[in-house]
Amino acid sequence: MSSILRLDRLRQFIGELATLLDSRPDESTLLAQAHPLLAELVHQDDWLPEDCARPDPQRYQQYLLHVDSRQRFSVVSFVWGPGQITPVHDHRVWGLIGMLRGAEYSQPYAFDAGGRPHPSGARRRLEPGEVEALSPRIGDVHQVSNAFSDRTSISIHVYGANIGAVRRAVFSAEGEEKPFISGYSNSRLPNIWDLSKENPA
């Protein structure tokens, strides 16, 4: 990684995604056109502030990087400690996941006739630079884990809302639905807008 933090990459992504949303595309078009934007962002690992890349030994961390002023989307760095794994959960909004560092596994789930979740389809391994889409329309129930037992992995998640305000659910093996709203691990946003440090007079 470069010693110079390229916050301009994150600013560019935010601006391009906001412009795309301004055109009010349908979901299929949105996911198709936002995919390469996120792929470009995670192709370079020189822009994420260190404060938003710190793992916790007890639990995976979700650092808010940006929320659109109209809450049309949010950008989160998802930091995995070694061997950490989520419960089976849904999202209720569209999302894109881009792998920045390390790798993660995503196992899709479906529900049987009795309402119990079960693995559905192949588990996918997401490598740096790769992007995966999800939504209630194409499938948004999955379980995700760090692919490594001995190191940190980081993925960048983009959601079609302020995910810190969306009521969604985790599911037990018996299909019991437990509502939750995922919070953020940071209390302050990274300052990506002070260009004076990047362009000194």
From Swiss-Prot:
Top-level taxon of the source organism: Bacteria
GO MF term (any one): ferrous iron binding
Cofactor(s) essential for the protein: Fe(2+)
The enzyme's E.C. designation: 1.13.11.91
Entry annotated with the keyword Lipid biosynthesis: no
Keywords, ordered alphabetically: Dioxygenase, Iron, Metal-binding, Oxidoreductase
Pfam families documented for this protein: CDO_I
Stated induction or repression of this protein's expression: Is expressed in low levels (at protein level).
Top enzyme category: oxidoreductase
Cofactor binding: number and manner: Binds 1 Fe(2+) ion per subunit.
Self-association and partners: Forms homodimer in the crystal; however, there is no evidence that the dimer exists under physiological conditions or has biological significance.
Family named by the database record: Belongs to the cysteine dioxygenase family.
Note: Does not contain a cysteine-tyrosine cross-link observed in all mammalian cysteine dioxygenase (CDO) structures.
Protein name (Swiss-Prot/TrEMBL): 3-mercaptopropionate dioxygenase
Organism: Pseudomonas aeruginosa (strain ATCC 15692 / DSM 22644 / CIP 104116 / JCM 14847 / LMG 12228 / 1C / PRS 101 / PAO1)
